[in-house]
Amino acid sequence: MWSLKIAEGGGPWMSSLNDHVGRQIWQYDDNGGTPQERSAIDALQAQFTRNRHDVRHSSDSIMRFQFSKDNPLPPLPLQVKVKGHEQLTRDIVEKTLRRALRFYSTIQANDGHWPGDYGGPMFLMPGLVITLYITGALRVILSEQHQLEMCRYLYNHQNNDGGWGLHIEGHSTMFGTILTYVTLRLLNQGSGAHAAMEKARAWILDHGGATAAPSWGKFWLAALGIFDWSGVDPLPPEMWLLPYILPVYPGRMWCHCRMVYLPMSYIYGRRYSSPLTKLTSDIRNEIYVVPYEEVNWDSARNDCAREDLYYPHPFLQDLLWATLHKCVEPILMHWPGSLLRQRALAMVIEHIHYKDENTRYVCIGPVNKVINMLCCWVENPNSEAFKKHLPRVLDYLWLAEDGMKMQGYNGTQLWDTAFAVQALVSTQLLDECGSMLKKAHHYIERSQVQEDCAGDLRRWFRHISKGAWPFSTRDHGWPISDCSSEGLKASLELSSLSGDLVGDPIPAQRLYDCVNVILSYQNPNGGIATYESTRSYAWLELLNPAETFGDIVIDYPCVECTSACVQALAAFKRKYPEHRSKEIATTIRQGSMYIKNVQRSDGSWYGSWGVCFTYGTWFGIMGLLASGETYSTSASLRNACSFLLSKQLPSGGWGESYLSSQDKTYTHLEGDEAHLVNTSWAMLALIASGQVERDPTPLHKAXVLLVNAQFENGDYPQQEIIGVFNRNCMISYSAYRNIFPIWALGAYQCKVLGH
């Protein structure tokens, strides 16, 4: 039986800065669980499979089942449902909150964070399985049970037409389908032994075969040895030898972009292809519409299925790749040009090792994690670097009733915990949540980054880190502007509470360090991006080679990061008014100007990291309020509130489809369904802006929805996918289903009913 292990190490090849606090891995025990418990898990899995085309998102039922044994649910107040035109009372809302808090306390890990599913993208696991197959480590790292659950996951998320999408709710794409098909074959699923595999192969061939895969798909197929490198657009490692002053220099790109193309360029530069085996030879024969020997590889370079085309290549880009492919690469592949290639490869692998070591081999994300691991093996199959990579694979795997998936990060630990603290404090029910806050404080304190990366930061293209907070764990360590800000906000909230209740506050100097990082992020336009200040120009997007994603080349400022930083600095300024007061005031003022400048004509803001306009508008409103704007004095705030009110559904809630993110147009969920997380974001924004003084009716209607949606055990339902990145790929934030209804009802109880 599977069990979730928290804050445990993984043997002599692993290191940690804080005793693995935040690490979450799933382990299988052949003798674990009673027959009744195993039967209960089987029933959860079977139920998901039965409903898989209607309910795409898992509910983290296996984790919840484990916690129900480890942390039994305490007695709950009697549940109250509001009927008809009954009014909400403080008593009803308080009972609902106490029920929610008591349940929420049962799913908190011992180290203080709340574990949860961060899956959704379908293109992550294939890279892992392909890499492990190439390196011969597939069955070393992935037990038979791992492989069984991975297959379960992939089959569960196959669309009716036989294909797989970019993410679990998306339409079928060649990227999702061909990589998933290859993955299942590498996991010993026969091409014709399963009807699902037959349908998948038919989908691939009906849509043009392997040559119609987008560039990232072609890369993985070429590395596996079933696609010719001459059919892949160039990824020259020599780009890293260019001077930094050039806008196209990779070190000036968004860190996620450069961290993926850095190891890709190493594999491409070496033209590494895994030797064919009987299995990969069979796969190669199954995925092309013409015999492999007859494929026109030059034509294949520019081929991409229309289902995958979110960002078609401009002509300028195709011309550049053709020139590099036909004129430059032949020179670099032969002496004396090969001398330059060897120098570039040496520089690239040096950077890869630096990145690995500074994240304890977690790496910044799952895509570059597995390509970095492949590079280390290609360089030296017996290297310590490769051995250090292997145990960290488990950090990315998550199990739910839909199977085992590869997550979009090694978790959302700090991010969710910082939000959770603010949600818990909003309820003012400290008698219920004191223990949770104390454990959460422990997690936040242990997860702060307390040093910059080693060496010359400019040489390694790293931003300062000391004092920041990461998205997940300290061992991961990449600092992010909004994570630092939410970590700072949570720390300030905790410092205002009794030390006897939550523990000693984080020392002021460490908060000063965080402020120093936040101040360093602001760009000349007042906006703040994610990991670093913006280093190059938006026109560089013309060179975006990834047909499936938008806005990936540079680190763009966004309303969420800017607002989070403004809110954090304003909160810090209230507690420490003398510390760098002029710089903080300037940053807040310029951030506020940016927020107003990027507001859309309808009053909304586009959310880059959540679905979508509801999320962005919550941040936009909160940022302007933190900067000192008010509803009566700010047209921006009035327009934003009008936008939110215009999208409220007859049910009292808000419900926004992921299509809003993809199409950049507000789109309701199918059937005008309300989403509890969208509803909570809208409530928080409207409550903060003073809606209770104008007309509290919309807030009352929304709060009734949240009260009535609560389960008997105090939990809330998992609904449609609510996270997004790069405009077109959706991702799960499973903890939001608890955090935001608690936060919204807490604010409603104290600021609306208590008004």
Curated annotation (Swiss-Prot):
SUPFAM superfamilies, per database record: Terpenoid cyclases/Protein prenyltransferases
Claim: Glycoprotein is one of the keywords in the record: no
Pfam families associated with the record: SQHop_cyclase_C, SQHop_cyclase_N
GO CC annotation, single: lipid droplet
Stored InterPro entries: SQ_cyclase_C, SQ_cyclase_N, Squalene_cyclase, Terpene_synthase_CS, Terpenoid_cyclase/PrenylTrfase
EC code: 5.4.99.8
Pathway: Secondary metabolite biosynthesis; terpenoid biosynthesis
Positions of disulphide bridges: none
Keyword match Repeat: yes
GO molecular function terms listed in the Swiss-Prot or TrEMBL record: cycloartenol synthase activity
Record's keyword terms, sorted: Isomerase, Repeat
PFTB repeats mapped onto the chain: 97-142, 147-188, 390-431, 511-556, 588-628, 637-678, 699-740
Annotated site, Transition state stabilizer, chain positions: W415, F471, W609
GO biological processes: pentacyclic triterpenoid biosynthetic process; tetracyclic triterpenoid biosynthetic process
Catalysed reactions, as listed in the record: (S)-2,3-epoxysqualene = cycloartenol
Annotated active site: D482
PANTHER family the UniProt entry points to: LANOSTEROL SYNTHASE, TERPENE CYCLASE/MUTASE FAMILY MEMBER
Family per similarity comment: Belongs to the terpene cyclase/mutase family.
Stated role: Oxidosqualene cyclase involved in the biosynthesis of cycloartenol.
Protein name: Cycloartenol synthase LCA
The organism of origin for this protein: Lycopodium clavatum
